[in-house]
Amino acid sequence: RHFVNQLYPRMQTMMDYVLGRTNKNGMVEGMTGDWVFVDWADGYLDKKGELSFEQVLFCRSLETMALCADLVGDEIGKQKYEKLAATLKAKLEPTFWNNQKQAFVHNRVNGRQSDAVTRYANMFSVFFQYLNADKQQAIKKSVLLNDSILKITTPYMRFYELEALCALGEQEAVMKEMKAYWGGMLKEGATSFWEKYNPEETGTQHLAMYGRPYGKSLCHAWGASPIYLLGKYYLGVKPVKEGYKEFAIAPVLGGLKWMEGTVPTPNGDIHVYMNGKTMKVKATEGEGYLTINSRRPPKVNIGTPEKVSEGVWRLWIDSPEERIVTYHL
């Protein structure tokens, strides 16, 4: 909360600037001289008109502004940003969804949808949960798992693509992709992750970027995103309230035989171990629920699991003792 208080005034001025660049439809649209950028792509990305990825990110930014306004006690700002976000969100599907393509199109120019479909707006809309479950599943098939859609070749943006798949329960497929893509860099001799990686390139092609033969960064922080995915979607640790005052833990093996890891929080570490029969969870501070998928009632050393639905249980954790759970897949 203290950190948000420090940043909030600058967040407001930034959002005021963005709001000042919206068109008559309330959507952000590039002006002459603007560099509209989402990713380095090995193909043509049209930047004309209203871009779907830009509106989805703009909407999420307004929602985040409302959340931060609430944290700092700015009730007027909260109401303002909530209204702006809700208004824009209501326009996303009517503007960009194409039933024939079963996806968001890339842009709308002069009131007409383009024929192009790219991954960006579609994957963002999935893990922002801007679409219903049926349309999210449609996007998985028509976009995320469709090799004919322009591929993403930067580790940073691949992270969002894989997060969308994780959000759809595809951890096993994502694990294979992480091993192939980030593992591909390691096989090329990488000791740190690169700014851009195209598995189809060979030799010194991997070093070229920006029109220069050795222009690529081979130690790029934005390439480290598997760490986030492993913590959130495999170890399953997420904040429920600001600063992890309350947490949720929902481990998923995702094709692994076992896993073990620690997620640091402001209140201390949350340690998770899981194999096909056992979970071990230890949270040094804070409180929250551990979700357990089990055909039969799980056995635990501390506490009593509560049945949430068929095959799903949860255990409340409010002390630092290790919880040991035996479950049945």
Language-model features: locations:
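Active-site acid/base region of carbohydrate-active enzymes
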Residues: 1-54, 72-122, 188, 244
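Well-ordered alpha-helical scaffold segments within catalytic/enzyme domains
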Residues: 1-3, 57-75, 123-133, 160-169, ...
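Extracytoplasmic/secreted proteins, especially bacterial periplasmic and envelope-associated proteins
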Residues: 6, 10-17, 57-60, 64, ...
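Flexible glycine/proline-rich, aromatic-decorated loop/lid segments
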Residues: 25-41, 135-143, 182-185, 189-203
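Aromatic- and carboxylate-enriched substrate-binding clefts and catalytic-loop regions
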Residues: 31-35, 47, 118-121, 153-156, ...
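Solvent-exposed loop and edge beta-strand segments that line ligand/cofactor-binding
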Residues: 41-57, 101-122, 128, 141-158, ...
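Repeat-solenoid scaffold signature
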Residues: 149-188, 204
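Non-catalytic C-terminal accessory modules of carbohydrate-active enzymes
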Residues: 175-329
